[in-house]
From Swiss-Prot:
Species whose genome carries this gene: Haemophilus ducreyi (strain 35000HP / ATCC 700724)
Annotated segments matching region Domain III, AAA+ region: 111-328
Annotated region (Domain I, interacts with DnaA modulators), positions in chain: 1-93
Protein name: Chromosomal replication initiator protein DnaA
SMART domains noted in UniProt: AAA, Bac_DnaA_C
Disulfide bonds: none
Keywords for the protein's UniProt record, in alphabetical order: ATP-binding, Cytoplasm, DNA replication, DNA-binding, Lipid-binding, Nucleotide-binding
UniProt similarity note: Belongs to the DnaA family.
Entry domain remark: Domain I is involved in oligomerization and binding regulators, domain II is flexibile and of varying length in different bacteria, domain III forms the AAA+ region, while domain IV binds dsDNA.
UniProt lineage: Bacteria, Pseudomonadati, Pseudomonadota, Gammaproteobacteria, Pasteurellales
Cited InterPro entries: AAA+_ATPase (IPR003593), Chromosome_initiator_DnaA (IPR001957), Chromosome_initiator_DnaA-like (IPR020591), Chromosome_initiator_DnaA_CS (IPR018312), DnaA_C (IPR013159), DnaA_dom (IPR013317), DnaA_N_dom (IPR024633), DnaA_N_sf (IPR038454)
Any one cellular-component term (Gene Ontology): plasma membrane
């Protein structure tokens, strides 16, 4: 039974690691110990502070996840302070096979997080199109022009949130709908288990009987030929019956490596929408929203400071709020810029080291195949001026330097020149797909 406990809690941690920030995972979840007895999973925290924090922030999700993974709706999960007992009387199931059937899975295992909705999704320029399409899919699941619906973008930008929001909205309108959200790795694991237990027909029947199938991180299907084969036939079965398919990946579907061309072709049948890294205003709005959800009083000037310093993704913004909140609760200090600077000094230092104006100039010059000196020159030719404007806009977005400081790094230009460059690039991103693609590619390079 110890092996069963270890496997269940390990599976829970693997799933939680994809849903929370690295900071939250390493600080609050990974150190927890687990034991199992009398149909109860007990988690052990190192002190009362950790116990209360996990209870408030993560226990509901842990309960849902543990019941889903154990296929036991009655499983009881508690958390207490202490260490895991060295010897336990553990009760085990007498069955070795876990059949994946429509009745046992769909009854309570949609995989959805009910807290991830459209209402608490913070919209900005970087994600407004993705949210609009997601809402359209939720309104009319299965419509041909949005089926399949593919979301793509970097880690922690809100793809998973939108998938859950679509599923929750569909179930809200039609509680009888068969809706399942699943990570691609879980799809693979379920298939392997079904093959091992000789229940592959139940596996096929379940997935092909759904009304809405949402698979996250489909890039993990790469090089898994058997899983791709099964997904291909599942896709065809659902599509032919006008059932909604929603997928998320870290790259534009046709650019995912080691995925069969016939699958890529089908992903192009519907609509693919990117989610970009959030701009400053959206980052600030996200920070304020996350603070409000946690009943944390976050001064606006602190939110702007954090928004300027942390520029990569939503997950890290949320992790920063959790870390600052925990520190201030523990020390009984108010959240100030000085407190944030002290608490997140390692994280902020890593960003400051990663994204500098010089680094931006280097990456932009390489991308456009020009010299760094060209960006600082007086040349006004289009082949030089446009990359220079792009570099200025990126410097404004990805660093905390002022406009005059940015101008000085580009050949001593005036701050009004930098303002004009930022305005030009922002306008072109709305009208010129090639500029938008360049901006996205450069942002990813600078944030990776």
């Amino acid at each position: 039974m110890e092996q069963i406990v270890s496997s269940l809690w390990s599976d829970c941690l693997n799933h939680l690691q994809t849903k929370v920030s690295p900071i939250d995972y390493s600080t609050w979840l990974r150190p927890l110990q687990a034991s199992f007895a009398n149909e109860e999973l007990t988690l052990y925290a190192q002190n009362p502070f950790v116990e209360n924090w996990v209870k408030d922030k993560f226990l509901t999700e842990i309960i849902d996840l543990a019941r889903f993974l154990s296929k036991n709706e009655q499983l009881k999960i508690t958390i207490r302070v202490g260490n895991k007992p060295t010897e336990q009387n553990l009760s085990a199931s007498s069955t070795n096979k876990e059949e994946l059937t429509q009745d046992t899975v769909h009854k309570f295992k949609t995989g959805l997080n009910g807290r991830l909705t459209f209402d608490n999704f913070v919209q900005g320029k970087s994600n407004q199109l993705a949210k609009a399409v997601a809402q359209q899919v939720a309104d009319n699941p299965g419509e041909s022009h949005c089926n399949p619906f593919s979301l793509y973008g970097g880690t922690g930008l809100g793809k998973t949130h939108l998938l859950h929001a679509v599923g929750n909205e569909i179930l809200k309108r039609n509680p009888q709908a068969r809706v399942v959200y699943i990570h691609s790795e879980r799809f693979v694991q379920d298939m392997v288990k079904a093959l091992k237990n000789n229940t592959i027909e139940n596996f096929k029947k379940f997935y092909r009987s759904l009304d809405v199938l949402m698979i996250d991180d489909i890039q993990f299907f790469a090089k898994k030929e058997a899983s791709q084969e099964e997904f291909f036939h599942t896709f065809n079965s659902l599509f032919e019956r006008n059932k909604q398919i929603i997928l998320a990946s870290d790259h534009f579907p046709k650019n995912i490596e080691n995925i069969e061309e016939r699958i890529k072709s089908r992903l192009n049948w519907g609509v693919s929408t990117a989610i970009e890294p959030p701009e400053l205003e959206t980052r600030v709005a996200i920070l304020m929203k996350k603070a409000e959800e946690r009943n944390v009083e976050l001064p606006e000037e602190v939110a702007f400071y954090l928004g300027q310093k942390l520029r990569t993704n939503v997950r890290e913004l949320e992790g920063a709020i959790n870390r600052v909140s925990a520190w201030c609760n523990f020390t009984k200090r108010q959240i100030t810029i000085d407190a944030v600077r002290e608490t997140l000094k390692d994280l902020i230092a890593s960003y400051d080291h990663l994204v500098t104006i010089e680094n931006i100039q280097k990456i932009v010059a390489e991308y456009y195949n020009i010299k760094m000196a060209d960006l600082k020159s007086k040349s006004r030719t289009r082949s030089i001026a446009r990359p220079r404007q792009m570099a200025m806009a990126l410097a404004k977005e990805l660093t905390s330097h002022s406009l005059p400081e940015i101008g000085r790094e580009f050949g001593g230009r005036d701050h009004t020149t930098v303002m004009h460059a930022c305005k030009t690039i922002n306008e072109l991103r709305d009208t010129d797909n090639s500029i938008q693609e360049d901006y996205t590619n450069l942002t990813r390079k600078l944030s990776s």
